[in-house]
Amino acid sequence: NSNVEGKSDRISLDSSYLALSNDLYWLNILLGGSYTWSESSVVKSAKISELKISQFYTGAQINLLGSFWQVSLSQYINYAAIQNLLVDPPYDEVHMFKGDFSAVSRIPHWPVYGLIASSWQHAVQEDLAGALTFSTGGSSSVRGYEPGFANGDDGYHYNVEAHYNGLNAW
């Protein structure tokens, strides 16, 4: 037990603009930002972090659609301004590249489908604030592990899954 407690609040605004589309694909332009403030301290002792983070991102997402498959690819460029009130100098700036990919396909007339999903992050700087690190764990990345069981400045993960959906209770 580390006796550390903290809180974090975040407000964000995300937008998507449909730039191109037809029956086989669509392209979205993405733009957004967020503001996060968090603090943590050793219980009944000293404050160990107090952060204010402003983030902005822009990117694109392309979706391709076939008769029995769909592919989605997103790429973002992120900028974050960090104010750490407990260090000197208290200001830092970070640039990151983030993305994700997913593909799903099914076999016609079979109750089987497959899924591939991945995400990545590359940060130009090192030693990112915890709120900006690439984190894995939980049901959306590494199943069976607690959310955030591993994190770092750069990261990549992928899932390959096969699903059977042919069981009927009645």
Please place each PLM-identified region on the residue numbering.
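C-terminal outer-membrane beta-barrel translocator/porin domains of Gram-negative envelope proteins
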Residues: 39-170
